[in-house]
């Protein structure tokens, strides 16, 4: 981030409610993490006190600090000079100024920020360094509702999950399952459906980010070691055939209810699964697709009918998996839905709303970057604090990066961070930060 020059080199101490987050900001500055953002994102807005990219970075830091609205920057970042210095910010703009900057974003600014976010992903993600010889890379994709006001650009009255008919937009996300990283996401109009065109857009974007695009032998071999787990809404014949011919492994469920009823009708014997009440059986006459697949019927007791069942047909190209393992593997896709929910609770996804679609997309990309930074930072800490490896987004935001303490600066550089020993996570976080940040640059200790 941009350096703030004090009038003279002096030692200054600040109390901070986010001292642990100050340590993360110090490390990100040391590795020049924000260089792609500053090089690519240039919003056309008049500069009075802060540059547009500085204001964009202020919103990003506020998200890491747990802000659920732009107004929360006044109670998280603006009142914390130590946090501002740690991330290299010269201060914090008023919340109305930050809102104006977001509203000034254009489609070109969104594209520039997306390029920078993808560049950062390629630099720091584990998914881009996946060992395909060791195991398959699993990608999950889903289309989730994002409530919005009726006057918001792109908002339409449509199916919004449990809310049924409500006004909003849709979020399409591709996730690297083993690493809990968001590979790509975008905000679309409310009535967007899980069609083949949207699937192609999402998969093509994920290929670009992960280096899976192209037709050379090496790239084809990587795609052959990549599995896509999709919601049943993407279980059409056209979508399945396109993915199979593209060279991917696929695990999903058929969309058509009439097709499912036809496939399960001849089945007589069912086997229990690990989930109580749910049963599974092999489909005797599977649907022929572009490449060989195995198909299993799954039935679950209906809550509406005393002796009734809900039926589904699971289709997978992973023929080597036993029937029970194939069903359990598809169940792992639910982690994506839980992850989106945790982003809503921890990072304000769906709560931070802008009327202008470009402004909402800019916020979405900052949220995507914040999600990935939290996941990467958890990995950086676990070398010295393995107990943090199981923490999700909500606990990372609320417990790990909200440890209070005292931050000492020499000039603009953070020299020492003392974390409050009374915090239950302070000892683990301190151990992780000590391994991450060399003592010659910044000393981290317990108060």
Where are these regions (language model features)?
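Dynamic "connector" segments at or just before major functional cores
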Residues: 1-165, 171-193, 197-220, 402-447
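Short amphipathic alpha-helical "interface-anchor" segments enriched in bulky aromatics
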Residues: 27, 73, 325-362, 366, ...
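Short, conserved catalytic/metal-binding motifs centered on acidic residues
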Residues: 58-59, 73, 94-98, 135-145, ...
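Short, glycine/acidic-rich hinge or "gate" loops at secondary-structure transitions
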Residues: 90-91, 215-221, 226, 381-392
């Amino acid at each position: 981030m941009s350096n703030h020059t004090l009038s003279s080199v002096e030692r200054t101490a600040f109390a901070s409610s986010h001292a642990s987050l100050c340590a993360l900001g110090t490390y990100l500055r040391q590795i020049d993490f924000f260089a792609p953002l500053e090089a690519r994102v240039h919003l056309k807005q008049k500069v009075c006190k802060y540059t547009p990219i500085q204001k964009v970075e202020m919103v990003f830091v506020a998200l890491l600090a747990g802000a659920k609205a732009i107004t929360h920057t006044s109670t998280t970042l603006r009142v914390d000079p130590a946090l501002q210095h740690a991330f290299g910010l010269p201060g914090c703009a008023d919340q109305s100024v930050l809102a104006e900057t977001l509203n000034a974003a254009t489609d070109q600014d969104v594209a520039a920020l997306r390029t920078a976010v993808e560049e950062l992903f390629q630099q720091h993600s584990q998914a881009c360094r996946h060992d395909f010889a060791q195991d398959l890379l699993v990608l999950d994709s889903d289309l989730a509702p994002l409530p919005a006001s009726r006057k918001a650009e792109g908002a339409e009255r449509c199916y919004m999950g449990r809310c049924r008919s409500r006004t909003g937009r849709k979020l399409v996300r591709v996730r690297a399952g083993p690493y809990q990283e968001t590979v790509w996401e975008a905000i679309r109009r409310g009535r967007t459906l899980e069609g083949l065109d949207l699937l192609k857009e999402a998969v093509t974007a994920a290929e670009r980010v992960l280096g899976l695009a192209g037709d050379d032998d090496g790239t084809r071999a990587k795609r052959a070691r990549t599995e896509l787990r999709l919601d049943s809404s993407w279980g059409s014949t056209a979508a399945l055939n396109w993915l199979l011919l593209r060279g991917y492994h696929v695990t999903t469920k058929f969309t058509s209810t009439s097709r499912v009823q036809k496939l399960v009708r001849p089945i007589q014997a069912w086997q229990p699964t690990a989930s109580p009440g749910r049963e599974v059986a092999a489909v005797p006459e599977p649907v022929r697709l572009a490449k060989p697949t195995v198909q299993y019927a799954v039935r679950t007791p209906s809550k509406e009918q005393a002796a009734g069942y809900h039926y589904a047909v699971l289709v997978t190209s992973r023929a080597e998996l036993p029937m029970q393992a194939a069903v359990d593997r598809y169940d792992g896709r639910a982690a994506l839905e839980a992850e989106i929910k945790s982003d809503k609770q921890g990072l304000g996804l769906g709560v931070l709303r802008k009327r202008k679609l470009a402004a909402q997309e800019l916020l979405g990309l900052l949220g995507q970057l914040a999600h990935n930074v939290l996941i990467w930072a958890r990995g950086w800490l676990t070398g010295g604090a393995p107990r943090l490896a199981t923490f999700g987004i909500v606990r990372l935001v609320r417990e790990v990066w909200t440890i209070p303490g005292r931050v000492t600066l020499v000039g603009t550089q953070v020299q020492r961070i003392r974390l409050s020993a009374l915090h239950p996570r302070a000892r683990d976080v301190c151990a992780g930060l000590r391994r991450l940040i060399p003592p010659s640059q910044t000393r981290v200790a317990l108060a």
